[in-house]
Amino acid sequence: MAPKRKLSDSDAPEVVHPSRQVQVYGDEPKPAKKRKSEPAFNKKQAHASSVNTIKKKIRDTTRKLERAQDLPADVRVENERALAAYQQELASAEAEKIRQKMIKKYHMVRFFERQKATRQLKKLRKRLLETQSTEEVEQLKEEMHILEVDLNYTQYHPLSETYISLYPPKGSKEDAEDKADKEKPPMWKEVEKCMEEGTLDRLRNRKPDITISTTKPVKLPERKSIKHKPVPKPKLEEQAPSIDTTGMNRRQRRAQRGVKDSRATKIAKNKSTGFSKNQAFGAVEGARADEAQDGNVSDGGFFEE
């Protein structure tokens, strides 16, 4: 059996088709592919669906700080730092939510205007190659610069901000000259400046200047100093001077000491309206009975004279 040929001994250039010579590297190592490295500011932020979760965390942390007044110092500081981090995270999520909304809203307008600017730019380049007069060349270069800025405007306009259209709608009666001389939006100048500085990507992904309101400002409760009420001292009862009660009965002794008679108080309490009427009626009937006994009235006996 014949031995295998080495790759260096084979006629590789003759066997391989000329159109595929680039794919045959021979002894040289295969060149590594360059990976596209995205800048740090172009990273995708928190998804818009996490806004409610972050708001719930902010509410829980706020209630914990407001209601628990006797928290230790280290726990309180940790919760305050967590609350600040949640608020910053909520602002980023709200900004991403606005960004996605703006992208969806102005996607078709940007696409059509980009296609229109590309077509017009191709026409001007073709005319530039065909023309020979220097004046026309200068004029075409100026128009090409305007269209290049228009094209970059459609591509690198900030995604989080309102997009202002460059071209009028189809129903307008403006001529081509009026369209060229039309006043550009304020962002157009910024795009032209960023083209010179090479910061178009940063302009495209910049955040809006509008401050996003996250939640109501949290007012942390002030610690109230506990004031201990002074304990009242027991009052010393003044001892009444001793009274000589020899030779007095019980009622007299109680009157001398200033003790109220419980029996008299009970009688006074029971003197209601009905009780007083009955008492008056009994007094009248008693007086009549006394008069009957004193007078010469027959009692129905057998020994009357």
UniProtKB/Swiss-Prot annotation:
Its GO biological process terms?
A: maturation of SSU-rRNA from tricistronic rRNA transcript (SSU-rRNA, 5.8S rRNA, LSU-rRNA)
Asked whether the keyword rRNA processing is assigned, the reply is yes
Q: Which family does it belong to?
A: Belongs to the EFG1 family.
Per UniProt, subcellular location reads as:
Nucleus, Nucleolus
The residues forming the signal peptide are none
| Matches recorded under Pfam families | Efg1 (PF10153)
Highest taxon above the source species: Eukaryota
Query: What's the gene?
Result: efg1
Q: Where is the composition biased (Polar residues)?
A: 270-279
Q: What's this protein's name? A: rRNA-processing protein efg1
Q: Identify the stretch(es) annotated as Disordered.
A: 1-72, 169-305
